[in-house]
Amino acid sequence: ISVSVSFIFLFVLFGAILDTAGGGKYFLNLAFALVGRMRGGPAKAAILASGLTGMISGSSVANTVTTGTFTIPIMKKTGLPAIKAGAVEVAASVNGQIMPPIMGAAAFVMAELLGIPYFTVVTHAFLPAVISYIALFYISHLESLKLNIKGLPEKEVPNLKKTFFGGIHFLIPIFILIYLLLFQRWTAAS
């Protein structure tokens, strides 16, 4: 377990450094650039941003604070009731706990106790995590239809190309981490 604990610390540190460097804001802007114009765009952007932020933080509380302080007021501004805006953000942020590659402390402890590679835990968690985010996206779409909530005006949505390339350096450490975990079978013991 001591190997797992030190590994957890490194992943939490990785997420904290990436977020402090602006990675959380980058993922938020990228999410709004991708889905902000859609019907119920702010709710969908909150879900997408929480999924992306959850990949690096593994903490539902950190995820909610990082994305929710920005997304909840925008969801409310477009007509989503406050309680539903909060529910969307919390549900999406809690799902960050099951979004690979970080997945919170439970995944590391699970791999250690079961004696299986962390890679195995990550690959088995990926599909359920994606399905949960698709379900949240669909529910927010249905709620947007029911409440007749439109997307954000074009002028309020960041430019996708400019946003993506303006923060592409935040994706490099994530791709390196995924490469090490998946292709080099990097584990807590290595």
Where are these regions (language model features)?
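Long, contiguous bundles of hydrophobic transmembrane helices that form the permeation core
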Residues: 123-190
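Hydrophobic transmembrane alpha-helices that form the pore/transport pathway of multi-pass ion
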Residues: 30-96, 106
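Helix-coil boundary and interhelical linker segments in multi-pass alpha-helical membrane proteins
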Residues: 111-127
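Alpha-helical transmembrane segments of multipass membrane proteins
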Residues: 51-52, 94, 109-113, 175-179
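Helix-loop-helix module between adjacent transmembrane segments
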Residues: 14-20, 49-63, 92-98, 128, ...
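Hydrophobic alpha-helical transmembrane segments
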Residues: 5, 43-45, 122, 171-172
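Core transmembrane alpha-helical segments of multi-pass membrane transporters/permeases
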Residues: 1-25, 189
